[in-house]
From Swiss-Prot:
GO cellular component terms, A-Z: cell surface
Family as reported in the entry's similarity comment: Belongs to the mycobacterial PPE family.
Transmembrane segments: none
Name of the protein in question: PPE family protein PPE44
Subcellular location per the Swiss-Prot or TrEMBL entry: Secreted, Cell wall; Cell surface
InterPro entries according to UniProt: PPE_C (IPR022171), PPE_dom (IPR000030), PPE_sf (IPR038332)
Role noted for this protein: Virulence factor that modulates host innate immune response. Induces the production of the pro-inflammatory cytokines IL-6 and IL-12p40 in macrophages via NF-kappa-B, ERK1/2 and p38 signaling axis. Can enhance M.smegmatis survival within macrophages and under stresses such as H(2)O(2), SDS, diamide exposure and low pH condition. Promotes the death of macrophage by apoptosis in the later stage of infection.
Native source organism of the sequence: Mycobacterium tuberculosis (strain ATCC 25618 / H37Rv)
Length: 382
């Protein structure tokens, strides 16, 4: 703009009629505050990153993090410097305005000059005001030049103060597509896991099928064998088998009865043989049998202690097995009498199925000739 072409009324009016330097001062303070905050943030972030990467977190990941944050730190530093420069430029503009305002002719003086010129011109009838009119015009010219000079200086200072560093947006310290890549990776991992699970299910199914295929011949053979057994059991053969079983049961019963009889015979033979001289037993053997429902003493065996009955050797216990019947005593209910003996008569101890003479009435009926005969009862098979 050509401020020299404008009269002082315009320039002075513009300078005095504007907003002044208050807005520039407020802008400078705001930019200064931004510069301080951004600078503090840059210092704090840099300190934290340095302490973290050198004291607590070290390694490739730490270096990668520091490298990713470094552009952001540079941006913070540049922004703080630009804000400080803007604040300084705003202050310079305010100072330039103040200078221009001080150099600008007040509009009141310009108006007064113009009023004086008009009065001098009106009263200059005889030319007496020519010098005053010239002085007034000269003063007005000075005002013109002064306002123009002030405006040019202000315009130049404002142009310098308006040169600011362009502000930029911070660069991304992370990959903007990272979330998408993470979601894709998660989906791929899930698909892979599902595929592995399906593959495992197929593998288990194949193994089961293989096992069943291997077991099929064995199962078929087992089924065939079971079917043969079932058919065999459905024939008349089981009748023969049942008859054989019954026959075997009879043989077992016979063997059991024979063993019982042989046991009784062995007991009796052992008793008699133990009393004979030179018996086969080298040590005394005691054997007791208590038949159910029959009174008497137990069956015993001993070596070298036999009693004598006539010409026979009998066990010593026979002499006390049963009380002897008095000599010449008549038996109840009979006409027989017991012959007199030199000593007590020993009798055979009670055996199964036998009755002791002293405990039975009429059991010894009949003639007596020396030793009382021994009667073995007949035992049935078990």
């Amino acid at each position: 703009m050509d401020f020299g072409a404008l009269p002082p009324e315009v320039n002075s009016a513009r300078m005095y009629g504007g907003a002044g330097a208050a807005d520039l001062l407020a802008a400078a303070a705001a930019w200064n505050g931004i510069a301080v905050e951004v600078s503090t943030a840059a210092s704090s972030v840099g300190s934290v990153i340095t302490r973290l990467s050198t004291e607590h977190w070290m390694g490739p990941a730490s270096l990668s993090m520091a490298a990713a944050v470094q552009p952001y730190l540079v941006w913070l530093t540049c922004t703080a410097e630009s804000s400080a420069l803007a604040a300084a430029q705003a202050m310079a503009s305010a100072a330039a305005f103040e200078t221009a305002f001080a150099l600008t002719v007040p509009p009141a003086e310009v108006v007064a000059n113009r009023a004086l010129l008009a009065e001098l011109t009106a009263t200059n009838i005889l030319g007496q005001n020519v010098s005053a009119i010239a002085a007034t015009e000269a003063r007005y010219g000075e005002m013109w030049a002064q306002d123009a000079s002030a405006m040019y200086g202000y315009a130049a200072a404002s142009a310098v103060a308006a040169r600011l560093n362009p502000l930029t947006r911070p660069s991304h310290i992370t990959n903007p597509a990272g979330l998408a890549h993470q979601a894709a990776a998660v989906g791929q991992a899930g698909a892979s896991a599902f595929a592995r699970q399906v593959g495992l299910s197929h593998l288990i199914s194949d193994v089961a099928d293989a096992v069943l295929s291997f077991a099929s011949p064995v199962m078929s053979a087992a089924d065939t064998g079971l079917e043969a057994v079932r058919q065999f059991l459905n024939l008349d053969v089981p009748l023969f088998v049942e008859s054989a079983f019954h026959g075997l049961g009879g043989v077992a019963d016979f063997a059991t009865a024979a063993i019982g009889n042989m046991t009784l015979l062995a007991d009796a033979m052992g008793t008699v043989g133990g009393a004979a001289p030179g018996g086969g037993a080298a040590a005394a053997v005691a054997h007791a049998v208590a038949p159910a429902g029959v009174g008497g003493t137990a069956l015993t065996a001993d070596l070298g202690n036999a009693s004598v009955v006539g010409r026979l050797s009998v066990p010593a216990s026979w002499s006390t097995a049963a009380p002897a019947t008095a000599a010449g005593a008549a038996l109840d209910g009979t006409g027989w009498a017991v012959p007199e003996e030199d000593g007590p008569i020993a009798v055979m101890p009670p055996a199964p199925g036998m009755v002791v003479a002293a405990n039975s009435v009429g059991a010894d009926s009949g003639p007596r000739y020396g030793v009382k005969p021994i009667v073995m009862p007949k035992h049935g098979l078990f």
